[in-house]
């Protein structure tokens, strides 16, 4: 039987014991997670919004144009409009209205439509092309590089984005993203969340779907992956659409892991 007396030393002893129990609990949970996902060999990542902050990056690129040309443009609205055209443009391809197109080409099509609406007609072809390549220069979230570097010590890391291969390779070089491989919906000639994208990725990695974990900030992406047997990690990015827009980040209980960022994801998988 242990006897405790009141006083500073006794309280300090209890605090130390309590901290030890807490650390043991955290370590134990990480160990259980590590064992639970021992079959996972690779992690595939959504990129736009999950790994990189597209909105702030596009705003910054637009502001640079304003400095050069004197444009008076609401660049936050422009970024939202550019991104907002992405889904409808993909649907036009899916419906057969448009032939298969790389995301670079879809982005340019949307940009050409937005230019007169936002008073950017003075932009010449070279500047338009360079502005379209802003999507190749998107900046990562603060935790992305450090978290991916930790996850890379255990898993094969790959993109799995609707962005085309050249875009993703250039982005990785620009932002120092430590991918082992760059996979894209372009390789399946489908866009997420079509099943072909996820299954093609697993096949190219030489893995079964259950040996792959899809990581994304978007629930629809994860639900589509889970339906095919992939493991799922939900990493919400509450400010993806700006600080003033509220988005539902309530996790789906069917997701295998929920993390606040990539370093938290590494912690929960027992990676130090």
Predicted segment positions?
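Active-site neighborhood of HAD-like aspartate-dependent phosphohydrolases
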Residues: 35-84, 117
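A metal-dependent, Asp-based hydrolase signature
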Residues: 69-70, 79-129
